[in-house]
Swiss-Prot record:
It comes from Corynebacterium glutamicum (strain R). It catalyses: (2S,6S)-2,6-diaminopimelate = meso-2,6-diaminopimelate. Its EC number is 5.1.1.7. Coiled coil: none annotated. Substrate binds at N15, N74, G84, N85, N159, N194, E212, R213, G222, T223. It is found in: Cytoplasm. It comes from the Bacteria. Keywords: Amino-acid biosynthesis, Cytoplasm, Isomerase, Lysine biosynthesis. It is an enzyme of class 5 (isomerase). Catalyzes the stereoinversion of LL-2,6-diaminopimelate (L,L-DAP) to meso-diaminopimelate (meso-DAP), a precursor of L-lysine and an essential component of the bacterial peptidoglycan. This is Diaminopimelate epimerase.
Length: 277
């Protein structure tokens, strides 16, 4: 039997998501439903789904049961621990729909609690800062894309990343690069990995492209921008700093500290509707 549910469509630096409000936790969102909804020809189309639910209703959640929980699913139906762009859009939705009372609040994720600050917001657009936690540098590894080997820094942001700073790579050459699914060290990354190709730090800025596990290339990846900033700073011999990260979908600001990191960037809610699943 077909089920009709409300949805919203939004994006954060063109990393796009379907928001499914499920405050009463009545929807059994299966992987098959996710794949169908995220299909860009037969469905609504998105890089993933953000289900809005209380942490108390999420199996395996380890956060405060009273928190709103970002139940994030990749476009292939798999569960994902964390999504920095998704958190900004999720926070925008909660605040603009009066599901929270303050501009500063916590959100539950499978990677733990993320604190957010709404810097500006209306029903359609917002600027949001997210406390992304301490980047966990896991070591050095490599990947192969189209027969070219890239060396990178393993960074765990609640989800796994391999951020590859490429010496001498220009922003224009990066834009022209043919990016395909990478092969990687499966012992180093047993649960798969998101791969970022990054230019060297110049004038406190880098350019980045990303291949996300379970999705493919996306226009942006929030956790990936933090991993990229961390790798670029390390490549430049720096332990902390503020980095503008330029992605195909726009720009974000990443701050890396000794004891944490933040991600600041835009969010947009572009459509509301109903869909049969």
């Amino acid at each position: 039997m077909n089920l009709t549910i409300p949805f919203a469509k939004g994006h954060a630096t063109e990393n796009d998501f379907i928001i499914i409000p499920d405050e009463d936790a009545r929807l059994d969102l299966t992987p098959e439903m996710v794949v169908k909804l995220c299909d860009r020809r037969a469905g609504i189309g998105a890089d993933g789904i953000l289900r809005v639910v209380k942490a108390a209703d999420v199996e395996g959640s380890t956060v405060d049961p009273s928190l709103w929980f970002m139940d994030y699913r990749n476009a292939d139906g798999s569960l994902a621990e964390m999504c920095g762009n998704g958190v900004r859009l999720f926070a925008h939705w909660l605040y603009s729909r009066s599901l929270v009372d303050n501009t500063s609040f916590d959100i539950g994720t499978r990677a733990g609690v993320r604190h957010v600050d709404i810097l500006q917001a209306d029903q359609h657009s917002a600027q949001v800062r997210v406390d992304m936690g301490i980047p966990d540098v896991t070591g050095l590894s490599t990947c192969d894309i189209n027969g070219q080997v890239f060396a990178g820094l393993g960074v765990d942001m609640g989800n796994p990343h391999l951020a590859c700073v490429v010496p001498g790579l220009s922003a224009s050459a990066l834009a022209d690069m043919e990016l395909r699914a990478p092969t990687f060290d499966q012992e180093f990354f047993p649960h798969g990995v998101n791969v970022e190709i990054v230019t060297e730090l110049e004038d406190d800025a880098v350019s980045m492209r990303v291949w996300e596990r379970g999705v493919g290339e996306t226009r942006s990846c929030g956790t990936g921008t933090v991993a990229a900033a961390c790798a670029a700073l390390a490549d430049a011999g720096l332990g902390e700093g503020t980095v503008k990260v330029c992605v195909p979908g726009g720009e974000v600001e990443v701050q890396i500290f000794d004891d944490g990191s933040t991600l600041t960037g835009p969010s947009a809610i572009i459509a509301l509707g109903e869909v049969q699943i």
